[in-house]
Amino acid sequence: MVYAQADGIVNQDSSDVTMRLNGAAMGKVIDSGSCGKNVNYELYDDYTLRIFGKGTMYNYDWSWSSSDNELYPNVPWVSWISKIKSVVIEDGVTRIGSCAFMNCSSLTDVNIPNSVKSIGSDAFYACSSLKKINIPNSVTSIGANAFFECTSLVEVNIQDGIVTIAEGAFCNCSSLKQIDIPNSVTSIGESAFNGCSSLTEIIIPDAVTSIGDGAFANCDNLEYVKIGKGVTTIYDCVFLLYHTNPNVKTVIEFTAETPVTLASVVYFDQVYNNNAFADPENVIIRVPETMLDYYRNSEDWSRYKDSFSGYSSTDPTGISSVDNGQSATKADAVYDLQGRRVTEMLPDRIYIVNGKKVVNKFRD
């Protein structure tokens, strides 16, 4: 039996090769080959897929199977995709190819090194067992549908460096509870986080200048969204939310002290420009006090004119007075001074109740 280090390639019959990564045996090689001009792969009998070499992986496409109504990537390890449990991408690989790990339904662990600069479209499409992903600061772009329908994905760590999050990148990641969008991001594509129904808070940094249609649609448990100063246009259905609980409201906070416009959409010769936030009753839209009259009198925003409230630059909470002695029940829609939904109600604090009152006491 032949042992090899992780940075070496052993040209032996795959049935006789056992790989060691950081001193630990990974198992016997059961498949191997090329997946890039200077990039190779090895699959071990513990279903760890190792990608190694220098440069980019090939971009692959996919095929649809009518027999089981499934998509299958045209990758050399396609016969193993339902069994692959771990993917180890070694330093030197600069791009994760399109459809590379599509439908690897047993995949739970992925290592992305600092050499990777981009993640291709559909790269981890429907990896339904993947729970966590760390994206290093070397990555500047996440391709379309890269993590589409990774339904078990709870945690995504994206480091500063990423510039573009493409359309559908995290669409239907229904278990995703938190996403920290780095300050380096300038563009969020259409439906990028559509259907991320476990998200409760989104902070969009000032560097973002473009948010595509439906980017956060159907994130029906969103409670707080802060939109940075770089966003000047809100496109159709960006925050189209349908709350099943009528007591839940989403607080949308604009930070720009210049007008944010609603883009128009033409559909069957009909012009629409007021579907950004679904029903006005579901949202509280907080804007700088200097912009409040603009929004309330704007024809574009007329559907939401009663949803707006203002805050001053010296009072970031937007609250200039407190109605002492008011109270709220636990059934009320209660928010803290940052506009975030309160789930644990503490005594002798100041809160926003149903978007109208400010209180400092609770009663059961």
Task: Name each region found by the language model.
Residues 97-102, 120-125, 143-148, 166-171, ...:
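Consensus positions within tandem repeat domains that build extended binding/scaffold surfaces
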